[in-house]
Amino acid sequence: MNPAHLLVLLAVCVSLLGASAIPPLPLNLVQFSNMIKCTIPGSRPLLDYADYGCYCGAGGSGTPVDESDRCCQTHDNCYSQAKKHPACKSPLDSPYIKIYSYTCSGGSLTCRDDNDECGAFICNCDRTAAICFAGAPYNKENYNIDTKKHCK
């Protein structure tokens, strides 16, 4: 085999090994992102809301900085309720990994009737938040803020 071909093959193998160390996104996070894309076409939810305000992204504390951040606070509270919901007791029913069925048509979201009780609850958490984001302004100055300063 040509040495140049071997180098290319080696580079591909090394890059694939490196990619395997990157953890996949929880499936529900992908569904939630797609719901937001339904209500806000052209948006980039995983980038735009991963580190926004006091509540969008991991954790959350203090007073929301704006309406979009309040959507995240409400969503966080809904997920907290889902974790305590009697129908969501299995570890597979975690709101971060639970898969549910929904439809998106013309910017309108519907949680399907074939969801179990836990899936329906989590679907409605995500649906409500996606609709909330669609009605709230996105303020770039609230992205990647100093939470120690602004989230008291």
From Swiss-Prot:
One of its GO terms (biological process) is phospholipid metabolic process. Transmembrane segments: none annotated. Keywords: Calcium, Disulfide bond, Hydrolase, Lipid degradation, Lipid metabolism, Metal-binding, Secreted, Signal. The keyword Transcription regulation does not apply. SUPFAM superfamilies: Phospholipase A2, PLA2. Ca(2+) binds at Y55, G57, G59, D76. Residues 22-27 form a propeptide. This is Phospholipase A2 pkP2. It comes from Laticauda semifasciata (Black-banded sea krait).
